[in-house]
Amino acid sequence: MISNDTRTAPGSATRAHNGVVPKAKDLEQRLQRTEQQLRLFQQISRMMVREMSLQEVLRGIVNLVVEFTACDSCLVYLVDNEELVLCASNTSHPSAIGRVRLRLSEGLTGWVAREKRLLAISREAYKDARFKFFGDLPEDTFEAFLSAPVIARNRVVGVINVRHKQPHQHTGGEMEVLTTVGEQVGCLLVVARMHPTAVESANHVQLVLSSGPAGAP
């Protein structure tokens, strides 16, 4: 005789419920993070089409990245011949903009530019053999390092760095976001070169620095 007893064993319903709830929460968190990413990209896109100087836009972008990643520092370097020049930062004194330089052969930032690849180091980035010390930048002692190339027309024109003072395990989402932001900055620079007031012979660094300091009218 075949039994049709479908009664659930004691505790099995609770176990099933306990398994479903974490999955639902995980899915909800992923959806929220995706919405935050889309919001970030939208904010950057809107900033790119406003009547703002390049320095203002870049400063706005680094501030948005800092807010999204909860990092302590975000820096944008742009290529000037064989050097990378600091053109935007959420922390550096204004005098550091355009002054801090490193060769493409130097540092973790130079490696990212040369290799055209993302680089993530969760702790003790300053111990990496490729690391370059500046001496006058607080980021010299920061633990975690995340960096992505700035791409314009399939060419590296800069690098964007995210730094954490404490060790930080970078998520796949953070890596994707920084990669996309690097591409958005590249698009911004391409569009800037099309502006009627842009000097044809000027490179990206000259375009940014000649646009006036952030906050200028």
Model segments located where?
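Amphipathic alpha-helical coiled-coil segments that mediate homodimerization
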Residues: 40-48, 53-72, 76, 108, ...
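A short, aliphatic-rich beta-strand micro-motif
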Residues: 143-151
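Signal-transducing coupling segments at domain and membrane junctions
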Residues: 94-95, 122-144, 164
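Signal-transmission linkers at sensory-effector interfaces
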Residues: 2-50, 55, 157, 188-215
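Acidic/proline- and glycine-rich, intrinsically disordered low-complexity segments
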Residues: 95-119
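GAF sensory/regulatory domain recognition
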Residues: 63, 73-100, 104, 124-127
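Allosteric cytosolic regulatory segments
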Residues: 179-186
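Short beta-strand-to-loop transition segments that serve as allosteric relay/switch motifs
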Residues: 92-93, 159-168
